[in-house]
Amino acid sequence: MKPSVILYKALPDDLLQRLQEHFTVHQVANLSPQTVEQNAAIFAEAEGLLGSNENVDAALLEKMPKLRATSTISVGYDNFDVDALTARKILLMHTPTVLTETVADTLMALVLSTARRVVEVAERVKAGEWTASIGPDWYGTDVHHKTLGIVGMGRIGMALAQRAHFGFNMPILYNARRHHKEAEERFNARYCDLDTLLQESDFVCLILPLTDETHHLFGAEQFAKMKPSAIFINAGRGPVVDENALIAALQKGEIHAAGLDVFEQEPLSVDSPLLSMANVVAVPHIGSATHETRYGMAACAVDNLIDALQGKVEKNCVNPHVAD
């Protein structure tokens, strides 16, 4: 008899078929208490869980006594109670490598669109404001040869540094938990403390996961240390930034502009002051949102769940010691 798994995110037909070759698959719309209650028998028997954008906490795990592995279609897993999963010896699988290049593309797009005011001036053209040769009020700022500060030199940080160094001749500063020898050798990146990075960078790109240590890592104190001409980019996790402090820094002119793919609350409220600022490029968490990459992430998540329930946890596992 095939193990039972719950799928709470739609999959392409071929990936669903692959999953069904190994498991009895039960599809649900979400993991809300109402859904769990209505499908209590299914949740009670499930050995696997696959999906994204839902909280998996101790209360849910209490309803799933046979759960052995959960697989998320994402690299981030701050919506999972890792301690609760680990205490119950439940494996947590994620997709850390599939989206690296695409997210780095998004970061570079935010750098370019904020510096060159692409969104702002495009809207002005559509509004009929381009009636003569443009003047300084339409100008942006150069990207090439400007200093890029990367906070978080992981896979995505490395991919961004590659684009910036080779494509735009940008000097690279970085701050991370440890020195990154490859970044220093390949891109001539310079490790520095966070204060130095903030003070010297023309672009500050934040690429950090959300943890207890990183929550509101960026606040009023950090923005005050940046150049008035600096541009802030966040494509990591929204709550790493105190959004009210960011809004205040933009309003006071402490920083020049911001390119944001993530926010403290998502979707972003239509009343957010960020949406009325011409110097803010706000996009709806599109970091990995291409057809190719989202398919690759889903395929990886399916393979991860198959591997996990077969006892193979050599890669993509957040808590591999559970299998020991």
Curated annotation (Swiss-Prot):
Enzyme category, top tier: oxidoreductase
UniProt keyword list: Cytoplasm, NAD, NADP, Oxidoreductase
EC number: 1.1.1.79, 1.1.1.81
Pfam families: 2-Hacid_dh, 2-Hacid_dh_C
GO cellular component: cytosol; plasma membrane
Catalysis performed (reactions): glycolate + NADP(+) = glyoxylate + NADPH + H(+); (R)-glycerate + NAD(+) = 3-hydroxypyruvate + NADH + H(+); (R)-glycerate + NADP(+) = 3-hydroxypyruvate + NADPH + H(+)
Main location: cytoplasm
SUPFAM superfamilies: Formate/glycerate dehydrogenase catalytic domain-like (SSF52283), NAD(P)-binding Rossmann-fold domains (SSF51735)
Entry's Gene Ontology molecular function annotations: glyoxylate reductase (NADPH) activity; hydroxypyruvate reductase (NADH) activity; hydroxypyruvate reductase (NADPH) activity; NAD binding
Role according to the record: Catalyzes the NADPH-dependent reduction of glyoxylate and hydroxypyruvate into glycolate and glycerate, respectively.
Description of how the protein assembles with itself and partners: Homodimer.
Family: Belongs to the D-isomer specific 2-hydroxyacid dehydrogenase family. GhrB subfamily.
UniProt name for this protein: Glyoxylate/hydroxypyruvate reductase B
Protein source organism: Shigella boydii serotype 4 (strain Sb227)
Gene: ghrB
